[in-house]
A protein has these predicted regions:
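Zn-dependent metallopeptidase/amidohydrolase metal-coordination segment
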Residues: 112-161
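A structural signal for short secondary-structure junctions
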Residues: 19-21, 39-42, 74-76, 106, ...
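Flexible, glycine/charged-enriched surface loops at secondary-structure junctions
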Residues: 11-27, 72-83, 111-116, 172-175
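A short beta-alpha structural unit
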Residues: 26-35, 46-53, 79-98, 124
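Short amphipathic alpha-helices in soluble, non-transmembrane regions
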Residues: 61-69
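Midchain, well-structured core segments that form catalytic/ion-binding scaffolds
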Residues: 1-56
């Protein structure tokens, strides 16, 4: 039943991403009891991280999980529970911060591009209290939060220059 649910969530996120472009769902923890190769587990607990830049899409994905759980209860005769242990709404970065980062990049002839982060960051918490922005150095192959992630030293140095200039301009109201 768990494998069906996880695959259903993956498919729902992929379908949503094809139309909206930013939905992501990840199952990062899985606990099976008993954990034996030849025993059907009596209890499975797992965590799912569902993200999108639009809260409506997140809500739709959660609703699809609820519907699949109900379907699995009926078809498989299992009991399920759904518990939301951590919920932070998507946060847009402040235009003043984004403009400062773009301006700093321009001043060093370093290309900057607006992207949506697929991962949760501290800025999601801070955005409720003040203006926030994020700066990412490019990772080879676009890999992020993965063992394949690698950023060249020169890209890290360039990002540091851009960040320093942007913070200076914001701190001195010189943007």
């Amino acid at each position: 039943a768990t494998s069906e649910l996880i695959l259903s969530l993956e498919q729902a996120a992929q379908d949503s991403a094809e139309s909206a472009g930013t939905a992501v769902a990840t199952v990062g923890e899985l606990s099976v009891d008993p954990s034996a190769v030849n025993v059907i587990p009596g209890l499975v607990e797992f965590s799912a991280d569902i993200r999108d830049v639009n809260q409506v899409v997140i809500d739709q994905l959660v609703d699809s999980v609820k519907a699949k759980l109900q379907s699995l209860e009926e078809s498989r005769g299992v009991e399920t529970t759904l518990e939301c242990t951590y919920e932070v709404p998507p946060a847009d970065m402040a235009p003043v911060c984004r403009d400062a980062l773009h301006g700093a990049g321009d001043s060093f002839n370093i290309e900057t591009v607006d992207i949506h982060s697929g991962a949760g960051h501290d800025t999601m918490q801070i955005a409720a209290a003040t203006d926030t922005g994020l700066l990412f150095a490019p990772s080879q192959g676009g890999h992020s939060h993965s063992p394949l992630e690698w950023t060249d030293w020169w890209d890290c140095a360039a990002a540091t220059e851009v960040l320093t200039e942007a913070v200076y301009k914001l701190a001195t109201n010189n943007n």
